[in-house]
Design a protein with these regions (language model features):
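RNA substrate-binding interface of SAM-dependent RNA methyltransferases
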Residues: 1-74, 135-140
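Short, well-ordered alpha-helical microsegments
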Residues: 32-33, 55-59, 79-80, 103-104, ...
Length: 164
């Protein structure tokens, strides 16, 4: 089980880097859901968050409905060797980011076991790099509809526009 701060950052990265939503497992965390929803309410976009009690059933259901599973792990194939094939596939994607002890079944259920380097590092970094490569950098200029708050890029200082 990852800590609350790491979970929050993982979900914020998913949202900011272009994911449509997340399924999360472990324990129901209403505070986590509220923190992320507040960001969506303030900063815009549509981002769905759903608790899933049984990760294995969710993964199997995703596959049976025609989707593909992309598991980010340091033991997988290097992203640079497979990202183009993943990008070109029309199937809906479920990206799985495991914690410290990923069950061996996950490696078997995944269509793709992908490494973002074959070194230990953060699951937040792995998701960031994967989404950046998947979207070919276009997520960096993504527009978020219904934003109440917007940053105005500055050479120096900070400027935020807040709409009521």
């Amino acid at each position: 089980m990852r800590d609350s701060r790491t979970s929050t950052h993982l979900l914020l990265v998913a949202r900011a880097f272009g994911a449509n939503g997340v399924l999360y497992t472990g324990r129901v965390d209403k505070a986590l859901e509220e923190r992320v929803q507040k960001v969506v309410d303030d900063w815009g976009g549509s981002f769905k968050m759903e608790y899933c009690n049984d990760w294995k059933s969710a993964v199997k259901e995703w596959r049976s409905n025609g989707g593909e599973i992309i598991h980010l792990t340091m033991y997988g194939l290097p992203i640079q060797k497979v990202i183009e094939r993943i990008r070109l596939s029309p199937k809906p994607k479920l990206v799985v980011v495991g914690g410290s002890k990923v069950p061996s079944e996950m490696y078997e259920l995944a269509n793709w076991n992908i490494s973002i380097t074959s070194q230990p590092h953060s699951e937040i970094a792995a998701l960031s790099v994967f989404l950046h490569e998947f979207f070919e950098g276009k997520e960096l200029i993504k527009h978020f509809d219904r934003a109440k708050m917007k940053i105005v890029p500055q050479k120096q200082g900070k400027k935020i526009i807040v709409e009521d």
